[in-house]
Amino acid sequence: MEKYIKEHTLKPNEIERYGRQLITPDIGVSGQMSLCNSSVLIIGAGGLGCPVALYLSSAGIGTLGLVDYDTVEISNLHRQIGHRESSKGISKAVSLSKTISELNSLIKVNTYETTFTSETAMEIIKNYDIVVDASDNVATRYLVNDACVLTGKPLVSGSALKWEGQITCYNYNNGPCYRCIFPTPPPVETVTKCSDGGVLGPIVGVIGSLQALEVIKILTNNKEGVLSGRLLIYDGMSAVFRTVRIRGKQSGCNVCGDKPTVTQLIDYTQFCQSNYSESAGKVDDRVDKTLIITVEQFNQSIKNNNNNHLLIDVRPKIQFDICSLPNSNNIPIEEIDKKESIEIIEKLIKEKVENNNNNNNNNENRDASDELSVYLVCRRGNKSQDAVKILDEKLKEFRDKFKLLHIKDGLLGWNESIDDSFPIY
């Protein structure tokens, strides 16, 4: 006599592990088997990718793919919960894979320690049923979207910044793709990065968990509840969830429309005028070389003539309060072109010039090295370039009274080249 009857292939240890899902309406045995036989690719093993991967692995997804070229840093740990202090310096994909294996040894995990690019995307995506966009930059979003449309894969997309996050599903059940909603990339200067705007760990946790939930709904064929053609927005500060309708599938879309013009992957860094990583490389020079000084030159200059300079830190006050160089004056870039700020800067310059003149018996013949230098600094040497251009124009009436210079590579450069004890964030 048989001990028990089961008309499915779930093993006893799987029934025990996934039991609470098995008895959930709209999941059941068929739903769990779909999960166990499915494969999901997660682009990004960071703030969003970690909760997505942890919850999908716990749910019993048969195969997970993790794509991330980056390594774990201590600054990641407040929000990237799949990594540990002991993982510092190792691949994020490998680190997250290790955590997943400790959580559920029944599933398979593939790691791709590479940048997701036009050259690698199609070969990786073709092996998976669903793709999750857990990236942090515009170029990757367009790339992932186009690759999913060209391969016919549903895309679950999420994003988070500061206290807010949002999630939707693209290329599913005749719904829109990312290009239907955003045909052209936003101007680079309008995009706020996580490293500049900040983000709370629980926010990416909420959005990542919701992304995992959308994947489960798609794989278990719960079509009606999927966020296709709808955008869910979460405001953590006010504790409000909103779901809004978004533009539907567009017949004129360049990639999923009736007559697509994008039939193969393109150069997305050129298309978006941005990199595949928000931390890729140094900040490019965008001002005349006469307005630039290196951190080494700045350090030597203030050593030689510590009193005859004015240092303006253009970071937001919330960042300035974390740490700053001695004798810095905080005037945020968002306020630097306002009348009140210009008046403050003019007053500071005039006071410095007057003090300098008083210290020189013969001002007309004084050494050029005694000329006042006005230095502008920010976190990475990006916003200080904008500031130097603004002040070069706003203060042109008495520009002959001082040198105006932006500090290349900013405070991160100061940490790397001058003082490694200076806090970075």
Curated annotation (Swiss-Prot):
Cofactor: Zn(2+)
Gene3D superfamilies tied to this protein: NAD(P)-binding Rossmann-like Domain, Rhodanese-like domain
GO CC terms: cytoplasm; cytosol
Highest taxon of source: Eukaryota
Biological process, per Gene Ontology: Mo-molybdopterin cofactor biosynthetic process; tRNA wobble position uridine thiolation
Compartments in which it is found: Cytoplasm, Cytosol
SUPFAM superfamilies with a match to the protein in the record: Activating enzymes of the ubiquitin-like proteins
Chemical reaction(s) catalysed: [molybdopterin-synthase sulfur-carrier protein]-C-terminal Gly-Gly + ATP + H(+) = [molybdopterin-synthase sulfur-carrier protein]-C-terminal Gly-Gly-AMP + diphosphate; [molybdopterin-synthase sulfur-carrier protein]-C-terminal Gly-Gly-AMP + S-sulfanyl-L-cysteinyl-[cysteine desulfurase] + AH2 = [molybdopterin-synthase sulfur-carrier protein]-C-terminal-Gly-aminoethanethioate + L-cysteinyl-[cysteine desulfurase] + A + AMP + 2 H(+)
GO molecular function: ATP binding; metal ion binding; molybdopterin-synthase adenylyltransferase activity; molybdopterin-synthase sulfurtransferase activity; nucleotidyltransferase activity; thiosulfate-cyanide sulfurtransferase activity; URM1 activating enzyme activity
Keyword tags: ATP-binding, Cytoplasm, Metal-binding, Molybdenum cofactor biosynthesis, Multifunctional enzyme, Nucleotide-binding, Nucleotidyltransferase, Transferase, tRNA processing, Ubl conjugation pathway, Zinc
Bound cofactor: record note: Binds 1 zinc ion per subunit.
Binding locations of Zn(2+): 177, 180, 253, 256
Domain Rhodanese: 305-423
Catalytic residues as annotated in Swiss-Prot or TrEMBL: 194, 378
Enzyme class at the top of the EC tree: transferase
Listed pathway(s): tRNA modification; 5-methoxycarbonylmethyl-2-thiouridine-tRNA biosynthesis; Cofactor biosynthesis; molybdopterin biosynthesis
PANTHER family per the UniProt record, alphabetical: ADENYLYLTRANSFERASE AND SULFURTRANSFERASE MOCS3 (PTHR10953:SF102), UBIQUITIN-ACTIVATING ENZYME E1 (PTHR10953)
Family: In the N-terminal section; belongs to the HesA/MoeB/ThiF family. UBA4 subfamily.
Stated name of the protein: Adenylyltransferase and sulfurtransferase MOCS3
Organism lineage: Eukaryota, Amoebozoa, Evosea, Eumycetozoa, Dictyostelia
Gene behind the chain: mocs3
